[in-house]
């Protein structure tokens, strides 16, 4: 009888200890483009004032779309820091690289600065192996407002959250390059 109780107790304890779930934390990498800024200073100033995300993206969980209408917010695959901060930091890094002669910052730089605000409405993986990044940005250039929508897709070549985050970062970098091209056209 004692052997039976010891066996049950051992199985119960083993079941309790193996129920541990690992949490994974993700940080967007800064995707390096072919363009490199040679100047660390410039006479043109750009303040990336904010990057906003909707409530469903503002939580800790990485978002995955499982059907046309259903989204899952992961419980164990989490952003290492708030997504809006990661998007803003990587945008500043990418624009700094792609805009020689500009000082790009996430803090106000002075009164004669251009100001960029971005609203991201989608930033997720999808059931068909694609990732979606969409939204709009608004640039205040010397009192002139320039507003552009964006919607980009990327394709995962492998399964998993690691790949999804890398592809999302690459697509976000593409949008940063697009914004940089628009800014370069300014007088």
From Swiss-Prot:
Chief location category: membrane
Q: Which InterPro entries match?
A: ABC_trans_aux (IPR005586), PqiC (IPR049736)
Q: Which UniProt keywords apply?
A: Cell outer membrane, Lipoprotein, Membrane, Palmitate, Signal
Compartments, as annotated in UniProt: Cell outer membrane
Q: Cite a single GO MF annotation.
A: identical protein binding
One of its GO biological process terms is: membrane organization
Does the record bear Membrane in its keywords? yes
Function, in words:
Component of a transport pathway that contributes to membrane integrity.
Q: How does it assemble?
A: May form a complex composed of PqiA, PqiB and PqiC. Interacts with PqiB.
Protein name in UniProt: Intermembrane transport lipoprotein PqiC
Tell me what organism the protein belongs to: Escherichia coli (strain K12)
